[in-house]
């Protein structure tokens, strides 16, 4: 339990550090390198378009990250007549998390990167957080590849160029042909790629569970759920204003029906 509580502190700090490093690289390396193009128009310069897109992806990722933490999915009134820490909740979808020390309604899982449980109130924000984090990381990787290609005069036309970049760069770094800042960007390329793929896979997995009207906790416990149309399951999580939620981080408006069903 001590290791889990320690991980609950280290994982959010790791995420915030990666976010800070990404912002620094974007502002002080990638954007200045795009401004050096004299043929680009001022109104639609690559630096302006890149900065606007990156800020949009980052604002949605960090905004939904904050909302996942603020929208605590606990429902301490779900267990009536006994202490939530000693008596299991009557509803099969409620769960007491020992790491959070709280009862979660429609518990899905505990996310260590947010330090919070994922349930009915913050499920939509969590899915959007995974989506925009994946897009921001993959887009940062593309921008980093363009920067490395221009600085080191490396062509990525060959399909295996990205796979052989790291071992080649390590040997060149120790020989003095690659600077420390350039080597750091190359390492970040692989880190962005790994985080982007992981978040994309997790987002797709959560969407499949939402379409089936299930949570990961119910799947692990083998709890049977009532079959419903997939459109209704999506609306229960994302609400009627789902398009607005895709563009602007906002509170979950689709969890009221799920709350009433589990009480």
Swiss-Prot record:
- Which Pfam families does the annotation name? DHHC
What is catalysed by this protein? Answer: L-cysteinyl-[protein] + hexadecanoyl-CoA = S-hexadecanoyl-L-cysteinyl-[protein] + CoA
Annotated compartments? Endoplasmic reticulum membrane; Golgi apparatus membrane
How does the protein associate with the membrane? Multi-pass membrane protein
Write the gene name.
ZDHHC22
Keywords for the protein's UniProt record, in alphabetical order: Acyltransferase, Endoplasmic reticulum, Golgi apparatus, Lipoprotein, Membrane, Palmitate, Transferase, Transmembrane, Transmembrane helix
Q: Does the keyword Transcription regulation apply?
A: no
Q: What is this protein called?
A: Palmitoyltransferase ZDHHC22
Q: What is the lineage of its organism?
A: Eukaryota, Metazoa, Chordata, Craniata, Vertebrata
Domain DHHC span(s) in chain numbering = 92-131
Q: Which InterPro entries match?
A: Palmitoyltrfase_DHHC (IPR001594), PFA4/ZDH16/20/ERF2-like (IPR039859), SSD (IPR000731)
Q: Which domain of life is it from?
A: Eukaryota
Major localization listed first in the record, in broad terms: endoplasmic reticulum
């Amino acid at each position: 339990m001590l290791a889990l509580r320690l991980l609950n502190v280290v994982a959010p700090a790791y995420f915030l550090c990666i976010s800070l490093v990404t912002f620094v690289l974007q502002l002080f390396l990638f954007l200045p390198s795009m401004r050096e193009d004299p043929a680009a128009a001022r109104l639609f310069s690559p630096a302006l378009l890149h900065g606007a897109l990156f800020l949009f992806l980052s604002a949605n990722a960090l905004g939904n990250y904050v909302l996942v933490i603020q929208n605590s999915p606990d429902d301490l009134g779900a267990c009536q007549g006994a202490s939530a820490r000693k008596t299991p909740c009557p509803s099969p979808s409620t769960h007491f998390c020992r790491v959070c020390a709280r009862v979660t309604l429609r518990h899905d899982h505990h996310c260590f990167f947010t330090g919070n449980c994922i349930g009915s109130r913050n499920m939509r924000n969590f899915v959007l957080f995974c989506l925009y984090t994946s897009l921001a990381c993959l887009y940062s990787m593309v921008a980093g590849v363009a920067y490395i290609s221009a600085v080191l005069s490396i062509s990525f036309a060959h399909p295996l160029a990205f796979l052989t970049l790291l071992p080649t760069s390590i040997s060149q770094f120790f020989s003095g042909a690659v600077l420390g800042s350039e080597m750091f960007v190359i390492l970040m390329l692989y880190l962005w790629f790994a985080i982007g793929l992981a978040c994309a896979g997790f987002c797709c997995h959560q969407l499949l569970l939402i379409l089936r009207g299930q949570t990961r906790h119910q799947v692990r416990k083998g709890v049977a759920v009532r079959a419903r149309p997939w459109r209704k399951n999506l609306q229960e999580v994302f609400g009627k204003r789902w398009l607005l939620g895709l563009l602007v981080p906002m509170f979950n408006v689709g969890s009221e029906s799920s709350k009433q069903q589990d009480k």
